[in-house]
Amino acid sequence: MEVAMVSAESSGCNSHMPYGYAAQARARERERLAHSRAAAAAAVAAATAAVEGTGGSGGGPHHHHQTRGAYSSHDPQGSRGSRRRRRQRTEKKKLHHRQSSFPHCSDLMPSGSEEKILRELSEEEEDEEEEEEEEEEGRFYYSEEDHGDGCSYTDLLPQDDGGGGGYSSVRYSDCCERVVINVSGLRFETQMKTLAQFPETLLGDPEKRTQYFDPLRNEYFFDRNRPSFDAILYYYQSGGRLKRPVNVPFDIFTEEVKFYQLGEEALLKFREDEGFVREEEDRALPENEFKKQIWLLFEYPESSSPARGIAIVSVLVILISIVIFCLETLPEFRDDRDLIMALSAGGHSRLLNDTSAPHLENSGHTIFNDPFFIVETVCIVWFSFEFVVRCFACPSQALFFKNIMNIIDIVSILPYFITLGTDLAQQQGGGNGQQQQAMSFAILRIIRLVRVFRIFKLSRHSKGLQILGHTLRASMRELGLLIFFLFIGVILFSSAVYFAEADEPTTHFQSIPDAFWWAVVTMTTVGYGDMKPITVGGKIVGSLCAIAGVLTIALPVPVIVSNFNYFYHRETENEEQTQLTQNAVSCPYLPSNLLKKFRSSTSSSLGDKSEYLEMEEGVKESLCGKEEKCQGKGDESETDKNNCSNAKAVETDV
């Protein structure tokens, strides 16, 4: 053994020579691969330059795509197999050369050790080459012509070419790029194609959602209600189905729907599913500028100070008209007014025995110089002027006369002119036909009763009455059920109490229709006491009637109250919701060009270290500019100081 060792050392052979030689062989192989790759890259660059030089006269970009496609269309498996076979032949030659060069070292080397090491080396190099080839194929760019007309703009990546937008010829991987959305610390992950279904929404529009992008974490951050976002994301995943979570209040979820800009149609459909009727409010304005100003002046009191003043005058006139309508029914005013109307109608024969009739007749009192008539005339003049002006300036005559408020205006004005025409006709008749005059007098009283509808004119200037009207209109289904239940209960219990009290001679229920009043009063828990059962059977029926009335009324009332709360909160918080939506901004310290860069990024993670360092440098430059600006101002506000301190904190995090 010692002789073998001496002979080995004398021949210059090291016992560890196979491992050292393997390291040298590995280094030479890497050098050879580097030279071969450099030569291949130079060949590709030369071919590309030649193609670009020949394609300048026409169809250059198209020819470039074809050449690139030709490079990518060769068989990668065949090229890898041929390279592997060449390497194996080269390694066999090298192994044979080493065995012939070191004949004395063959006894010292383990059998097959060098061949095993070279085989491992070749396998590692093959793996590295395959990974590099896959990366080369991953960077391949497909043109729109390669994929036909099926390529849409939603399948292309946005790019920043200095012109403010556009799309590059890079396709998404079948639109399966993933995006991370952070809602108040709760992370959601979805695909880009899911959001692209609704490009008009906040999440579907790349331009809109860019302001909420956080490049440090490569995600979109929204400081919004977390439970609501489950339904918002499901809206995109389901293709347009919007369902409110059970644990989210209606008004909060409505705010979230408006913030994410799902659209008015989606909001109306959601409200219909919740049980609210679709509102048909015409907010159109006249095209003529003069008519537009008049329309705003009389229709929208909140539009300007003069419009508010006109609204106040209109409310005062309505109140005066209602007060006059009530005061003229007092006994001391009613007698004189009836006598005046009778004298105006020519009814002298009916007033001969009345002591006040000669006094009124001699004093010259007529209906035209009555104080109530004069005040009412002034009110009617204002109502007529307001109605004519609004009719002149309205955007659409058809919609104007279909509006319920305008119909109320007409109904409140017409009785005055009918009364005036009737009085003039009776004066010209000269008092003939007392029966006809009495009938006209009764008709005038009924017409004067219609003037009570003027109180509904206040709803034009009262938010509370408008909310009540919207509530009743939205609760028509529940009100119909309530009336139907009451109708059934009235019929059932009035019949029962009639037959229960049939044998009692002193009963108050002479017939079933007579018992209707008692059943209604009992079911509504009013109980006037004018009609009551006497027998034991009648009292049992009355008890059941009261219990059934309580249950019948209690069932639909919560829905009506819920509708009222919704309309009340919507009217009082509409402006606050708009301000919250408009004031939602993104991080102010990120430069716009940096956001555009990350918006055009094709990866859902930072990945490349150079991109991360470039992003870090851009953020620092922006923060340094903010800091210098803060330090340069001697009288900065408290908000600026806080912003500067926040800038330093963000810079430290970066």
Curated annotation (Swiss-Prot):
Residue segments, region Disordered: 24-145, 630-654
Motif (PDZ-binding): 652-654
Protein name: Potassium voltage-gated channel subfamily A member 4
Compartment(s): Cell membrane; Cell projection, Axon
Extracellular side: 328-371, 426-440, 499-512, 533-539
Complex formation: Homotetramer and heterotetramer of potassium channel proteins. Interacts with KCNAB1 and KCNAB2. Interacts with DLG1, DLG2 and DLG4 via their PDZ domains. Interacts with SIGMAR1. Detected in a complex with KCNA1. Interacts with KCNA2. Part of a complex containing KCNA1, KCNAB1 and LGI1. Interacts (via cytoplasmic N-terminal domain) with KCNRG.
Motif Selectivity filter: where in chain: 525-530
Chaperone found in the keyword field: no
Annotated positions of the Phosphoserine modification: 122, 600
Compositionally biased spans, kind Basic and acidic residues: 630-641
Intramembrane segments: 513-524, 525-532
Ranges of biased composition (kind: Basic residues): 81-99
Catalytic activity: K(+)(in) = K(+)(out)
Region (S4-S5 linker) residue spans: 463-476
Topology in membrane: Multi-pass membrane protein
SUPFAM superfamilies: POZ domain, Voltage-gated potassium channels
